[in-house]
Amino acid sequence: MNYYYMAMRGSLVVGLNTDLDHHLADEVRQVIDEVVEERGIRSIIFDFSKVTFMDSSGIGLIMGRYKKMHQNGRIAIVAPCRSVERILQISGLHKLVTVFESMGEALDSCEIHDDNIAAEKGGKRSVKY
């Protein structure tokens, strides 16, 4: 399997087990959009620890999910390699997403972010996974 996904602590974790190119980006995009819609996910965390290459379709995947999530959620990327981190810098995505060294840090940060948004809107989030 080239990727996995799971709902975890209010976030959708998407782990990629190979490089992110146009072949994989379209499939992952469809899965993410479906799960976010069905479960009311507010944050998406991409685990890039096994990704060594990302082309423009990977940038498009991240940018598209950012556009859908940025008002009520966030996008995080975990453990990108130097070449992928450079692509994030060159494309400007580093200004839109948060990069973390570990999954634990990303989950903690997204959970706090979700709780803060819920508090701003007058209540705690009550989405169950």
Regions found by a protein language model. Give the residues of each.
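STAS-typified acidic loop motif
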Residues: 2-30, 48
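Residues that form or immediately flank small-molecule/cofactor binding pockets and catalytic motifs
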Residues: 10, 82, 104
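Poly-acidic low-complexity segments
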Residues: 21, 47, 119-123
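Amphipathic alpha-helical interaction surfaces in cytosolic regulatory modules
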Residues: 22-97
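A charged, well-structured terminal subsegment
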Residues: 101-129
